[in-house]
Amino acid sequence: MPARFNIGAAACDRHADGTGRLALIYEAPDGTVERFTFDELKRLSNRCANALAGFGVKAGDRVGVLLPQRPETAIAHLAIYKLGAVAVPLFVQFGPDALEHRLADSGAKALITDGENLVKIPPGLSDLATVLVVDGDNGGHPPFWPTLEQAGDEFAPVDTAADDPALIIYTSGTTGKPKGALHAHRVLLGHLPGVQLPHDFFPRPGDLYWTPADWAWIGGLLDVLLPSLYFGVPVLAHRARKFDPEEAFALIGRHGVRNAFLPPTALKMMRTVPSPCQRFGLDLRSVASGGEALGEDILAWSKEALGVAVNEFYGQTEANLLVGNCASLYPVRPGSMGRPIPGHRVAVVSATGEPLPPGETGIIAARRPDPVMFLGYWNNPEATAAKFAGDWLLTGDVALQDDRGYIWYKGREDDLISSGGYRIGPTDIEDCLMKHAAVLMAAAVGHPDPVRGEIVRAFVVAKPEIAAGPALAEEIRAFVGQRLAWYQAPREIVFVDELPLTATGKIIRRELRSRTEP
């Protein structure tokens, strides 16, 4: 790990050599397509850095970025890193309360957004001195592009240490109030092996990367945008108001996307589209997925329908891309997240941090120091300390590791179901439910029971053409009971129109647990 490193310089400036190397393709909602070279990104991000400096932003100051996938988002990030400031990515689907919490908690001094999202910014944020507005009604704030036109083309990136703060990414809030995970510039370097292996030795000539995941989350930003730019691979940017699997395939085909990060929720929806390769002219080389466990059925479908094996990877906001698959190096075992990525010390440990032998269930942990590991929770030393047992960062995810090194995810600690003396992970049940021909999506949670402590309750979204009812519920119950242990079979099956999901596509099981009526 180098002592000095700056994300903005490494992901942009070193490729801006005057050759017109393609960096970014943007397809706007109206279908208009723009292309940006690394030379253009360098010039525009330099102007943005100069503009922010002119408004008094300096190294260490926090700058919010509230924009969807679009060129200005990439320009803003590169500028903030070059300036030595700290980027605070913000999801455009957040409401006023969520934005207020993140902007106030981070003490953001500046914000780059658009007119559509400006209206959600609450008044009275005492630290927020500057707002740049990309388009739409700027509400009297400086407009982004005219401001950049008045700024200079030259900017010398701050000589940051690899351990200097670079960005704050707020957790998705699946287990409580979102906390700001502070990452250093080195986090990009730490991600690289976890991008290269799941994408079968990324990059290769002709690679072009796209994800529907928003760049405000660690998956979109550090699994896709920044590593691709670091490797000199162009990225496709596109914002869909709502994920549509047919349009996703059409987008991939139109632009010749070779590499995709597709969250499990997206893959489950895309599985319903018939003959995608033939209909859309796909030429995918690699597909990676993470965020929720993938089922065996998705892996089988991807090989048959897409012609590629989906390589699952694993991480979290605090320490990402720790575990993954690489079909080119070792077999993808359905149900396993893969093996520890080289460069990371990963183990399954007890609650007190003792590594467990193969086959024993415990908590996935990463040992510090590690370049992908966060510096700590912003302004929350107590929560930071609670995240560790000695030098082991405890992810809170329960799994076992077999004697071949594969890690098998069982669920979050707080998602485990305790029934009749058995500790049951929801993942195996959900994987089995997804194999039933009538099931589109499924989630399993514990429900209080006076005899067993808890019973397994499954929430099921049936496929659109299926009539859900008691007969189907009994059929699904029997289907699971024949394939898993008897105590894993759901006692109750509840049909719902949709599952509650976080903005990153993770099932919010606590919300399902709180539903007292079937």
Question: Where are each of the predicted segments found?
Answer:
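Conserved pre-ATP/AMP-binding loop-to-beta segment of ANL
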Residues: 20-22, 149-170, 177, 202-208
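Conserved AMP-binding/adenylate-forming core of the ANL superfamily
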Residues: 24-78, 95-100, 146
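Conserved AMP-binding/adenylation subdomain of ANL enzymes
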Residues: 189-208, 216-258, 273
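Gly/Ser/Thr-rich phosphate-binding loop
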Residues: 230, 257-261, 271-332, 345
